[in-house]
Amino acid sequence: LLDKAERDGVETTYDRKQNFKAQCGFGLQGNCCRICGMGPCRITPKTPRGLCGADEHVIVGRNFARMVAGGTAALSDHARDIAHTMALASRNGNYTIKDESKLITLAKEWDVETEGRDIYDIAHEVADVALMEFGKPYGVARFLKNAPVKRQKVWKELGIEPRAIDREVATIMHSTHIGCTADIDSLIHMSLRTSLADGWAGSMIGTRFSDILFGTPTVRETEANLGVLEENKVNIILHGHEPSLSEMIVLASEDPELVELAKEVGAD
């Protein structure tokens, strides 16, 4: 593929890396700060603090915390989309409930009434509860109770139980802004809490809801990587792991009109 890219004149990440020659040494060490308008500031033996007074530990801590916030926002927004999708699911719609038993199990975990109710009514209420996990004003993430009790105790004692997902991201963003947190311990503390919001709130919602909507995965043989490409077929490659889009591409590929169109242009 790299040879083909070179022949076709397609620039790859390796080409761009080569063009960089030497990357910024301060950036590689993480002791360069460009968060506020007074900077950028870089730490050296002669200038051990930035203009705001932050030393290298605080600068690295702020940069790391913002990376955590960015990653949490990305994965959790994926979960938000899946929750929205389940809120719109319907029996005759494009998105339906594939794993009803997993939905019922989750509903009971969250104290959502299931007896005598239509499965889609249950799904919509569970979706609403999940969406509240992003901005609820009180309490901690619901999925924390699924962790081992010993681990829950550690999180509670350390004070890193995540609250609402969006709140943890916002806390990092404002705390790392100009004139705010300059204590490395506090920065690491909020980074840990936000990481747990990612893993035990956003990611858990995305995973459980994907199983409910699209079916719980089972072990099976399949093709991967370059093995999926065929000359005599229409090849559609999706970048990312958003199943709500992938499922609709699969649905569209089975549309008789589109299948006929593909055959007209030479596909098997």
Spans of model-derived segments:
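Metallocofactor- and cofactor-centric catalytic cores in central/energy metabolism, strongly enriched
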Residues: 1-268
